[in-house]
A protein has these predicted regions:
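Short beta-rich binding modules
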Residues: 1-201
Length: 201
């Protein structure tokens, strides 16, 4: 084996450095909000990127981004939601906007999405199944929905797993049908999305 370049300068890391995010409802801050156009389908969605704002997991996704040593590192897709806002989905998009308004005193949506940056909102993170590059499946903790901050204390997050087909099973039932364990299934850096430098401000 040939010696790796900069071996002496590389900081050693172990699995103990990775602290998985538990499922639950968190006070979050919006880091970025913009119209997203799918390059393949041309479909427009409203992309919202967030981070944890308070508590033991404050800046969780920012810290993961900064610790990622990959040259093409990107913001973790587990902290991003793509919201449809056309046709029958208008009501759901309005639900998101209303949650932002209710969570930020004095804020009123004026159709300028750049003003959403820095606004607080409740983010609910739950288990979700995904397909790995080798074709096998595992689960990860991903942003599932938004709620108003005043509703956060009443939110009960169960341990159900959202499957790829859209249905739900309990975490124990999922593990019962897979030869997997908790630590092996939570993806470390998961899917990622491209960000700009100002998202970290």
């Amino acid at each position: 084996m040939e010696k790796i370049n900069n071996w002496e300068e590389v900081e050693a890391k172990g699995m103990e450095d990775f602290k998985p995010l538990p499922i639950g409802a968190y006070e979050c801050v919006i880091k970025d909000a913009r119209i997203n156009v799918n390059e393949e389908t041309g479909k427009e969605t409203f992309k919202v990127s967030i981070d944890i704002a308070t508590g033991d997991y404050k800046d969780y996704f920012k810290n993961r981004y900064e610790k990622n040593t990959n040259a093409d590192k990107k913001w973790d897709n587990n902290a991003v939601r793509y919201l449809a806002y056309q046709g029958d989905n208008v009501a759901y998009f309005k639900g998101f906007i209303t949650s932002v308004e209710n969570s930020n005193s004095g804020y009123k949506w004026d159709w300028d999405e750049t003003k959403l940056k820095g606004k607080k909102i409740c983010g609910v993170f739950q288990y979700e199944e995904y397909e790995k590059q080798d074709g096998t499946r595992g689960i990860k903790v991903r942003l599932n929905k938004f709620r108003s901050l005043d509703k956060m204390k009443d939110i009960e997050v169960n341990d159900s797993v959202k499957l790829i087909n859209g249905s739900y099973v309990s975490y124990n039932e999922y593990n019962g049908t897979k030869t997997i364990n908790n630590s092996a299934n939570i993806e470390d850096f998961g899917d990622v999305v491209e960000i700009t430098d100002d998202i970290l401000d």
